[in-house]
Amino acid sequence: VERSRGLGDVYKRQNLFNPKKLTLSGFLIAKLKDTNGKILSTSKFKITREEICFEIDKLENIKLWDIDNPVLYTLDIWVETPYGIDNLSERFGFRSAEFTKDGFFLNGNPLKIRGLNRHQSFPYIGYALGKSAQYKDAEILKYDLRINLVRTSHYPQSKHFLNRCDEIGLLVFEEIAGWQHIGDKEWQNKSIENVQNMIERDWNHPSIILWGVRINESPDNHEFYLRTNQMAHRLDGTRQTGGVRKFIEGEFCLLYTSDAADDLLC
């Protein structure tokens, strides 16, 4: 969903994986369903290239995704070709989210953010946290700790956790992997690739309101972070970017007496 195209429209970019370079032909069928499974729209498009872009517009009575009423819609995609049939189902929500000098606004309404960092590790099982535990963590953050935003410290986290955040209305600040270190050019190129992989995997989650494109608590590096920001905004023009810098090795360290981190928005 693209905010700039209006909350009543859906803009879809579907990329087809074609490693064998087969001749492209056939049809793509898209069905949009509401939270009760009712079909709101059915569209059919001819396949002529690996990237297919289309719009479903003039939708009426659309309900917004919000932290108190996280309404989700489903877009079912079928690809029918001479080589077979494939399908994909994605949930999403209609919402706008924006950080301004006057604060954060969700669907045009001011919202004071109360958030925590979250690692998806657990005693005895490490990072191999299953679906039910991922769900439970999201619920603890939302209902027991009463926060409205979670920062994925410091890496993209399980799809099960993000799915539950979508379902219960918990906002997400999702980060690329890393902590206090910036490596050489090869390392930096891999981090930029991580930005792309994170966004392309998770861009349909309405809970995600901010892409974290800085290595956590890392020193300043204008060239590197210009590239991570450019990658994020090229892939997703609907979300802002952010990150956490390390003051003691940053440009503004003389202005502070501690090495506390500061959140940045770009």
Cite the ranges covered by each PLM segment.
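Substrate-binding/catalytic cleft of secreted carbohydrate-active enzymes
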Residues: 139, 149-258
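Active-site loop signature of alpha/beta-hydrolase-fold enzymes
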Residues: 119, 179, 263-266
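Disulfide-stabilized cysteine-rich extracellular repeat microdomains
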Residues: 97, 121, 246, 262-263
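Single conserved hydrophobic/aromatic residue that forms the stacking wall/gate
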Residues: 1-11, 256-266
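Secreted/periplasmic carbohydrate-active enzymes, especially glycoside hydrolases
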Residues: 5-156, 163-164, 169-172, 194, ...
